[in-house]
A protein has these predicted regions:
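ABC-type nucleotide-binding domain
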Residues: 348-617
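Transmembrane helix-loop-helix hairpins at lipid-water interfaces of multipass membrane proteins
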Residues: 29, 35-89, 169-174, 274, ...
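Juxtamembrane loop-to-helix connectors within ABC transporter transmembrane domains
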Residues: 19-20, 28-31, 38, 93, ...
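Cytoplasmic coupling helices
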Residues: 95-114, 128, 152-156, 179-221, ...
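Membrane-integrated ABC transporters
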Residues: 1-49, 64, 68-75, 93-97, ...
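An intracellular "coupling" helix at the cytosolic face of ABC transporter transmembrane type-1 domains
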Residues: 25, 29-33, 121-122, 138-147, ...
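Transmembrane helices of ABC transporter permease
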Residues: 30, 34-44, 149-203, 276-293, ...
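Helix-loop-helix
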Residues: 63-74, 167-181, 257-326, 331-332
Length: 617
């Protein structure tokens, strides 16, 4: 029902938004010179298209009036020359339009991809991947057509139409006026049918985008597994089939609308030609015009109604292209909520500590970070977000470990996400450095900050690539020997030895060909290659069996040597050795201290410790 309501409401705009066309022209600035050349070629081509019927009429006159064979031969040669010139111009036009179109696709894709990469994590937590991919592919290609077929067609048809009418009036103004009488019968239905076809095309595009989103989610390893585990293949197939059936029905309606449209136009054009032959023949018999003029007018009439047909339907093409541009510009107009300062301060090449000073934080509202069309909802919700961190003060010195414990939803992962600046605080500050030399993370560059901080989550992400490819994501220049060393340090040496393809083994999407423990250790090996000075472990051993947990814990111990660490853990046994343990509840730090100190204090940590180990007993 939601998709149906979206399809009905998401119609083509009735008018062009102000500033869209100038913005498109500015975006194509790199292609302006080639565009001017392209327009010049189309103008010459239009002149040739009008010239051939005139020459054909002169051939008829030369034959009827018996002015000489040489005249006929010269005119025929001129027609042949124009045909060759038109063919060569057509090749040149095609080459230039392809260069412009493909260049525009390249520019748009680079711009959208780069812009999306700069968006904060909050954007990706809300956006449906398939919809975003559709913007990068389908809409970019739709925008490209505006500078190839649509633009060239408009220019060629307008020039050809003007020249054709001018030449026809010169040849026989009476017949030209009669031919133009049929224009209202021609144009009005064309505009009406054009709107119908445009609406059908847009609805089809929306349904195709929805199917792309469904396939993207269901064909991932995790999505496919979930579908099978819940016995939903049939339901998914029916949902997909329903959308595909609607696309099929729309396709049939569009094809029939196009056919009715073209049949009507062909009929009107045929009636006009019959009128030209009838009236023109009568005028020729009475000696008012030459027989060749009648032939020229009849041929020119095809040059008149052909462009009119395309121009009558041009609104559909233009509006479709503008819709594509608008959908691309929608993404480009989303402002990244996290930006770098132009005068970013470089971080010192020394061990780094982390400090949070009176940090308050609220997750951003959906309307500030996303688009309803990218989430495939009718409208974004406008709920009042509540503050999730309230005056948090924490500090971990260089080389020490800070552990965050507390119930689920207390704010531990939120604190961890603020350190690499995946979000910005509302007030207060997150700083890195050491006593006497602290730097607000908003004052340094993303590359500098994230090069100094490594993160291992409970569900480390791996790309559909080889083991080597995933590891080199952290250090592209790493040698095979360095990769092997990192794998051994992450306790994956035995696995590597057992794999026939070794480093060239493909891990599958999200690493699904590996076990949970192997995936975690591979992400740890990747972190070891990056060699960060600060390591954040967000429940890195959660959901692992005992044997895998032991192996991962050994790998983590290796990874933390000589590094500052912020560790989030539900299993208190894994953080006994932490220099500082902070208990987080309801977005506040309610206790801090070492394991022994907090137990002796008999506060919230002692309660958590007693509950966990009493339950284990």
């Amino acid at each position: 029902m939601l998709m149906m309501s979206m399809s009905r409401d998401d119609k083509l705009p009735r008018s062009v938004p102000k500033g869209t066309l100038p913005r498109i022209w500015r975006f194509a600035a790199a292609h302006h010179r080639m565009l001017y050349g392209f327009l010049a070629l189309t103008t010459v081509s239009a002149v040739i298209a009008v010239g051939v019927p005139v020459l054909a009429g002169r051939v008829v006159d030369a034959i009827v009036n018996r002015t000489g064979l040489s005249t006929v031969i010269w005119i025929a040669a001129a027609i042949a020359g124009l045909a060759v010139a038109d063919a060569l111009l057509g090749l040149a036009e095609r080459w230039m339009s392809s260069r412009i179109g493909e260049g525009l696709i390249y520019d748009l894709r680079r711009a959208v991809f780069g812009h999306v990469q700069a968006m904060p994590v909050a954007f990706f937590t809300r956006t449906r991947t398939g919809s975003l991919v559709s913007r990068l592919n389908n809409d970019v290609i739709g925008a490209q057509r505006a500078f190839t077929s649509t633009l060239s067609g408009l220019v060629t048809n307008v020039i050809q139409l003007v020249l054709t009418v001018a030449v026809m009036i010169t040849l026989a103004w009476q017949i030209t006026l009669l031919a133009l009488v049929l224009l209202p019968i021609f144009i009005l239905p064309a505009r009406r049918m054009g709107r119908t076809i445009a609406a059908l095309q847009r609805e089809s595009a929306n349904l195709n985008a929805a199917m792309t989103g469904q396939m993207t989610e269901r064909f991932s390893a995790g999505g496919a597994t979930l579908v099978k585990l819940f016995g939903r293949p049939q339901a998914e197939a029916e949902e997909f089939g329903d959308r595909a059936d609607r696309v099929r029905a729309i396709g049939v309606r569009t094809a029939m609308a196009n056919r009715v449209f073209m049949t009507s136009l062909t009929l009107v054009s045929a009636l006009a030609q019959a009128m030209v032959y009838g009236v023109g023949g009568w005028l020729a018999f009475t000696g008012r015009i030459e027989a060749g003029t009648v032939v020229s007018l009849a041929l020119l009439l095809t040059r008149l109604y052909g462009p009119l047909t395309q121009l009558a339907n041009a609104r559909v093409d233009v509006m479709s292209a503008l819709v594509s541009f608008e959908r691309v510009f929608e993404v480009l107009d989303l402002k990244p909520s996290l930006t770098e300062r132009p005068d970013a301060t470089p971080l010192p090449a020394t061990p780094l500590g982390v400090r949070l000073r009176d940090v308050h934080f609220t997750y951003p509202d959906a309307s500030t970070i996303s688009l309803a069309s990218l989430e495939e909802v009718a409208t974004l919700e406008h709920t009042e977000n509540h503050e999730v961190l309230h005056g948090v003060d924490l500090e971990v010195a260089p080389g020490q470990m800070l552990a965050l414990v507390g119930p689920s939803g207390a704010g531990k992962s939120t604190i961890a996400s603020l350190v690499p600046r995946l979000y910005d605080v509302d007030s207060g500050a997150v700083e890195v450095g050491r006593d006497g030399a602290w730097t607000d993370i908003r004052d340094t560059s993303f590359a500098d900050l994230r090069g100094a901080i490594g993160v291992v989550t409970q569900d480390g992400h791996l790309f559909h690539d080889t083991i080597a490819g995933n590891l080199r994501y952290a250090k592209p220049e790493a040698t095979d020997a360095e990769l092997v060393t990192a794998l051994r340090r992450a306790r994956l040496g035995a696995l590597l030895a057992d794999l026939p393809d070794g480093l060239r083994t493909v891990v599958g999407e999200r690493g699904y060909r590996l076990s949970g423990g192997e995936r975690q250790r591979l992400t740890i090996a990747r972190l070891l290659l990056a060699a960060p000075r600060v390591v954040i472990l967000d429940e890195a051993t959660a959901h692992l069996d005992s044997e895998s947990e032991v192996a991962v814990q050994e790998a983590l111990t290796e990874a933390l040597v000589g590094r500052t660490a912020i560790v989030i853990a539900h299993r208190l046994s894994t953080i006994r050795s932490a220099d500082t343990i902070a208990v987080v509840e309801d977005g506040r730090v309610v206790e801090q201290g070492s394991h022994d100190v907090l137990l002796a204090r008999a506060g919230r940590y002692a309660d958590l410790h007693h509950t966990q180990f009493a339950g284990a007993a």
